[in-house]
A protein has these predicted regions:
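Extracellular/periplasmic carbohydrate-active domains that bind, remodel
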Residues: 21-233
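Bacterial N-terminal signal peptides that target proteins for export
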Residues: 1-9
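Short intrinsically disordered, low-complexity coil segments enriched in acidic
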Residues: 1, 13-15, 225
Length: 233
């Protein structure tokens, strides 16, 4: 009887493990190269799209250095960065062209390396690092109060619900490090944020409902945390 129980439990554990594996896409298995030079944007974006289309899952980025242009996160997708993973943002300003209109007709001019709009249940987890390379001369054109082109953020989520960002390290943003605008149910925990490479290097700008921020270390050039209320609704 005991042997039968053990066999049943083992079979259940195998089934559970298989379901986890089935719901995870390792981007290196799709051709991504962590050499710090290869542009991995298309491969990672396709993995995000596939996970979301199937109802959800994890996009796993193993240890290595991955150059990317902006990646759009989508509903029910967890972007997981292994320990030793480094995402490097493109240093071409022309790559950050994801402006869009708000519902009131005004135009948003900002952009983000990892961005989402109108999505649900999105997360960024793991102990990897995201480096915006914001100290590059491409992004050195002064304080935003002086006008001129808009510099990109590292994380920019707009009108999203159910956001979890935990444990990752964020560094060297060209502008604000992260911005959660018109979002709801936001959990930010255990982040390490370092950015002294450009003007207006806020660590965290938040304009959201039901947000919890805890256990973060923020060392930046401008405001560590900036609470905003730009949208009365």
């Amino acid at each position: 009887m005991m042997n039968r129980c053990n066999i049943v439990l083992f079979a259940i554990s195998l089934l559970f493990s298989s379901s986890l594996i089935a719901g995870t896409i390792d981007v290196t298995k799709r051709g991504a190269k962590g050499d710090g030079v290869t542009d991995n944007t298309i491969i990672i974006q396709k993995a995000v799209d596939e996970c979301s289309k199937k109802g959800g899952g994890t996009v796993l980025i193993p240890s290595g250095s991955y150059l990317i242009r902006p990646i759009e996160l989508k509903s029910n997708v967890n972007l997981h960065l292994d320990f030793g993973t480094l995402l490097l943002g493109s240093t071409r300003l022309s790559d950050y062209d994801n402006a869009f209109p708000f519902k009131d007709g005004s135009m948003n001019q900002s952009s983000g390396l990892l961005f989402a709009r109108g999505q649900k249940n999105i997360s960024i987890t793991g102990f990897g690092t995201i480096d915006g390379q914001g100290g590059n001369k491409t992004f050195q054109f002064g304080n935003d109060a002086d006008g001129g082109p808009k510099r990109p953020k590292i994380i920019y989520f707009v009108e999203c619900k159910g956001i979890v960002v935990t444990d990752v390290t964020l560094r060297n943003s060209a502008y604000w490090v992260q911005h959660y605008e018109k979002c709801e149910d936001v959990t930010i925990r255990g982040l390490k944020v370092f950015s002294h490479c450009n003007y207006n290097n806020d660590g965290l700008d938040i304009d959201a409902k039901n947000a919890t921020i805890s256990d973060c270390y923020i060392d930046v050039e401008d405001d560590a945390i900036c609470f905003k209320s730009d949208h009365p609704e």
